[in-house]
Amino acid sequence: MQSLAVTIQGEGPAVLLLHGFPDRSNLWRHQIDALKSDFTVIAPDLRGFGESDRPDDVDAYRVGKSVGDLLAILDELGVEQAHVVGHDFGAAVAWAFALSAPERLERLVVLSVGHPGVPIDFEQREKSWYMLLFQFEEAEELLRRDDWAFLREWVGTHPEPDRVIADLQRPGALTAGLNWYRANRHPRRELDPPREFPRVTAPTLGVWSTGDAYLTEARMTGSAAFVDDWRYERLDGAGHWMQLDKPDEVSALIRTHLC
């Protein structure tokens, strides 16, 4: 198991909060404050991010490996079941958790990213152009060039770009973050036959924000076909990082679904 930095606050039923790229657990600070009065909030820095280990092997960043990390955290804390809330790559991990360890899941909340079985249409492929760029070993050099000018433009809707860049400037951090794309979004996976997924049986809330520059609404709404108990909320006036753009609204949506 990798060494992970984990923030734990509050008492009550356990809730895992899972961030994505290029963030760390403090992305959830507003939601932690809103939930800790009624829940034990567990917010890890996923492997490669924040203060957690940054393994060298690309395959170490497969989402299934992070599911294993989460199960180990719950086992260490003596938690049988938890609610799981994920955003961006954290949402991909949350879906994988629901599919591979349904007996450990109470309720699921996914922000921005829909079920992996939803077909990828042309609009989504256009928005996902950067995933191909990140496969190349020169990507790190391009992103760092001219005081991170390319990255600053790419994360232009992030409310905290300087914090993100400070994180990625640490030794090995940028490569670790890009390895999530190299491990899980490699173009060769387009040639794999369609996967059969078990039904998601946990009550699931999907939230998509109208200002998301990276994910389409159809990717989220299409998740309904794979979930037994599905609820969808469309959040107006927020970008991809809705936890920071609309913290009170996001916290209220999560709390309403979990309570």
List PLM regions with ranges.
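Two-component system phosphotransfer/interaction surface
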Residues: 251-255, 259
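A short, glycine- and basic residue-enriched loop/turn
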Residues: 24-25, 92, 238-239
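Flexible "cap/lid" subdomain of the alpha/beta-hydrolase fold that forms the substrate-access gate
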Residues: 4, 14, 49-85, 89-234, ...
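Conserved HGGG/HGGXW glycine-rich cap/lid loop of the alpha/beta-hydrolase fold
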Residues: 7-56
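Conserved acidic residues
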Residues: 45, 236-237
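Catalytic histidine-centered segment of alpha/beta-hydrolase-like enzymes
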Residues: 238-247, 251
